[in-house]
A protein has these predicted regions:
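Histidine-acidic metal/acid-base catalytic patches
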Residues: 2-12, 16-135
Length: 135
């Protein structure tokens, strides 16, 4: 956050990525959202489950190599998406929202089906926004 104050530009901000915060062992809940809210430009949702024997790994700046499994955003056992959506509602988030998950998507039909399922999931978690559009 100190760097944001130094940069001090209205078009420069943060992307809130709870899954990556979780991989790094950082809190991603309400306290974090309150701190980041004034600087957030996008919410980027994906879902991971930490697993020492997981098939995917990434080097992190604070925990070294971390192994995990990719999960669909609606699956439990990874990011607490209920808490994330409740927190976004509490801070009044009405900005951009991106969902990322390439795992298991190999065809255009796979992508359309996944996008539709994601849209339904997001609609079920947001209050007053039944107009979420699948592009």
């Amino acid at each position: 956050l100190a760097n944001l104050k130094v940069i001090d530009q209205p078009n420069f901000g943060l992307i809130y990525e709870p899954a990556n915060l979780m991989l790094c062992g950082e809190p991603y809940g309400m306290g974090t959202l309150r701190q980041l809210a004034p600087h957030m430009m996008n919410v980027y949702i994906q879902n991971h489950r930490l697993d020492e024997a997981g098939p995917v790994s990434l080097p992190t700046y604070c925990r070294g190599e971390v192994h995990f499994n990719h999960l669909p955003i609606w699956e439990t056992g990874g990011v607490d998406t209920a808490a994330v959506f409740a927190g976004l509602d509490e801070i009044g988030w009405d900005g951009h929202f991106t969902i990322h998950q390439a795992e298991g998507i190999e065809t255009a039909d796979d992508a359309r089906a996944y996008a539709g399922r994601c849209a339904a999931f997001v609609r079920s978690r947001t209050v007053g926004d039944s107009n979420a559009e699948v592009i």
